[in-house]
């Protein structure tokens, strides 16, 4: 049997097939312009102009703009803004996945790569390859069974001789992990370190892209939105880099407005629903034959008909108004796109030396379109347009940040202002007798919410000092529930679980080489998922000193690195640590001695970083009676849900106080006493059938015994 096999692509131009011609994309205006980064582009040009080792590799963190710098260089090539030796060069982005795809037979991959390299070599420097994620060439194409070489080893000789030019891009981590390990490959490339741009540089880059976003999304982007995107992404998104994270915010906010513009306005939608409801009612009444002859039915039907006609008229008017607004706005965007297209043609004609066509565009077409655009914008600005939003402002950016991080950044609504102003009153309903402690915490929260606090530290950090059972943990729970409408916003760590030295690994993750390295730390992961929360470190004095050392960085800078090197942002957390240290002195009213015991236990650098040490008062009798009434009210509320009604006599409150309260143990024994003595008695009566649903009962103390009797009124 004869098998004739011709390798796929024998006479094909693989470079055109699997490469992306960036020059063509720039000419077709498919590539976004780059503003700034002049030093990096100049360094790229200098390396490409060398005789040997003329292969630059751009190294930087993800999102800093490595690929954009290459595209910026290509834009300069297209506009002839480069030295003579680099004019007319073509830059192809090589797809490594396309290179290896379909190479079924041994030697086919090597033939394909050699065909491409031969074409690049024969171009005499007219073709430059760009390989994004260049670290992937190490090992790509190698097959242990056949002994084939990978791309890196195929490229090395040609790179060394300067026969081909390659631009690479990769991250610092992957460069170190793959390319630095191969010394021969590393020395054939010249590194260009791409740093994250400053906030001002990122803002300049975004201002250059603003027009492209506006044309793509058919919206208007205010400059305040660009400033807000840079500032908010810098402050609230720590895991990513500028300008990528700021660009993402603008793009998402613009997409949100675009989606709203594409759908019907809320005003029209609600009118349509109202019309459907009335039409359904009208049809149902008309089909009802029972009351056909009644005058009231006829009058009501006529009233419904008039109401429907008025609503339909209003709907049609709104739809026409909406369509007109939309048409006017689309006309503005159409003119902007035409101006953009003419600008691209102008650049092309100028680079080609076609000055006749360029002058026609520059002095005739563009001025005419700009005049039309100005007229259309004035007309749109003076007309009423309330049906849909067409602008992206800082509010939309804040909304996107809030959705992605859970941090409330939208402008304070009146309802939220009232909530913050009455925050202390709400918490005082739950936590009794600790007004000073509550006020200290609430004032810090208010400062943080209106952005007066230091932006590089947590919202606030406190040590709650007091004897057991005085409300330290309860205050933290109340704060989470009142502030975030959810007690789950409280992230609690019982520090009795962190008494050993190695417990630090539980908080930030195990170090490399240890079991559990791939898993995240409990503290760092919890804050990454819920960046706006209350952190409670209960009984902090029980933790090992090394555990408290981890908190030093959090309290000072508002950040913490986990075991995998990721920086976690604690700047939107409220940190509360509770402690029973010196509680015996606080019972005697000796605060100075309580602080001395705190200073003996914790290091000065730890205490110095805490915003405030909050003392919890010893519970007075009136406060304890108020707590008892509150606990009985909670019990009554639970019973009411089962249609069981109980009234608690005043002598019961006094009896519970005398039987259960002890200054040394605080309020906790009271809850236990109510559960054991009152709730248990009610449960037994229910099981015995002595309690009926819907009937009221009175619980009182008779001769030091708790009794349940039916109310006379029942």
UniProtKB/Swiss-Prot annotation:
Residue numbers spanned by region NBD2: 416-618
Location of the region described as C-terminal in the Swiss-Prot/TrEMBL record: 619-714
GO molecular function, one term: ATP hydrolysis activity
Chain residues that bind ATP 1: 60-67
Region (NBD1): 13-196
Pfam families: AAA, AAA_2, AAA_lid_9, ClpB_D2-small
Database matches in SUPFAM superfamilies: P-loop containing nucleoside triphosphate hydrolases
Residues reported to bind ATP 2: 466-473
Coiled coil: 247-385
GO BP: any one term: cellular response to heat
InterPro entries documented for this protein: AAA+_ATPase, ATPase_AAA_core, Clp_ATPase_C, ClpA/B, ClpA/B_CS1, ClpA/B_CS2, ClpA/ClpB_AAA_lid, ClpA_ClpB
Top-rank lineage group of the source organism: Bacteria
This protein's UniProt keywords: ATP-binding, Chaperone, Coiled coil, Cytoplasm, Nucleotide-binding, Repeat, Stress response
Chain intervals for the UniProt region annotation (Linker): 197-406
Primary localisation category: cytoplasm
Subcellular location: Cytoplasm
Record text on subunit structure and interactions: Homohexamer. The oligomerization is ATP-dependent.
Function of the protein: Part of a stress-induced multi-chaperone system, it is involved in the recovery of the cell from heat-induced damage, in cooperation with DnaK, DnaJ and GrpE. Acts before DnaK, in the processing of protein aggregates. Protein binding stimulates the ATPase activity; ATP hydrolysis unfolds the denatured protein aggregates, which probably helps expose new hydrophobic binding sites on the surface of ClpB-bound aggregates, contributing to the solubilization and refolding of denatured protein aggregates by DnaK.
Protein's UniProt name: Chaperone protein ClpB
Source organism (scientific name): Mycoplasma genitalium (strain ATCC 33530 / DSM 19775 / NCTC 10195 / G37)
Species classification: Bacteria, Bacillati, Mycoplasmatota, Mycoplasmoidales, Mycoplasmoidaceae
